[in-house]
Amino acid sequence: DTLLQRVKNESLIYAVPGHPMLAEKTVQLLLQQTEYEVTVLGGQSYLDDLFTSLKIDPIDGFQFIDGTSFERRQLDYRSHLIFCQVYDQFIASDVKIALLEDLPPHYPVTIIDAAGSERERIETVALETLDHSFIQSNLTSVYVPPVQSYELNHHFYRLKEVIQTLRGPNGCPWDRKQTHESLREYALEEVYELIEAIHLEDDELIVEELGDLLLQVMLHSQIGEDAGYFTIDDVIGTLTNKMIYRHPHVFGDNMIESMSDLTKKWEQLKQK
């Protein structure tokens, strides 16, 4: 607002560190307004200095993430991760907490401040200590190197890779010979075992049995993919579309007056 007030009376030069189109929210806000003309003049991106200082090649894949606004599900740990805008201890703590959901406490991360300048500071620390003695600076980034697959076994894509391997040319003979028909009895068996775990109110057992049931879904999906008919993405997409369609009171503008009204509309939608 201050800039827009001043530009009413005079032309302004608004200078930012690095390239104006890189991680500069104020520049984006200025470009969105239509009352005044904005000319963007390029500068050297600080990412160039960052890659040089860290000695990494972005061709291997990297994600550039705003440390003040991101969701854990967006992170691709197979790539180089660079968190920008980590300008104080509170943001560093948020980044650390999110990463600890997926990575071990001792995983190495690198704090880099003022990359490429005479004041450049680089320090590699254990993830669990990322926010300890953090120096406040608006030129600080955090680098997370690519994570090995065995650290990511709780991610869905790793499960998919494992099932593909089991069904692949060098996979398990038992898994490779299975068909939709041969797996039918196992699907039924796993459902009953899940019901028993629920009856016992055993959370650990429920987790295990849900995994066994998911295995059946993954095997059937891989069989479908191997035959060229469908993939797990088709299964997920079909389910997601169905849930959105059958919940117009959540994802649309429909209103419900009672649980009986909800049940009635649900049954009507199922018939279509």
Per-region residue spans from a language model:
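Amphipathic, non-membrane alpha-helical segments in soluble helical-bundle scaffolds
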Residues: 149-156, 177-184, 203-210, 229, ...
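Charged mid-protein connector segments
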Residues: 226-272
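Beta-strand/loop-alpha-helix module characteristic of Rossmann-like adenine-cofactor folds
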Residues: 2-4, 8-13, 21-24, 31, ...
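Amphipathic alpha-helical interaction segments
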Residues: 29, 49, 161, 182, ...
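Active-site flanking loop/helix segments enriched in acidic
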Residues: 165-192, 197, 201
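An amphipathic alpha-helical micro-motif enriched in hydrophobic residues
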Residues: 187-195, 203-229, 233-241
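Histidine-centered active-site/metal-ligand motif
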Residues: 180, 220, 247
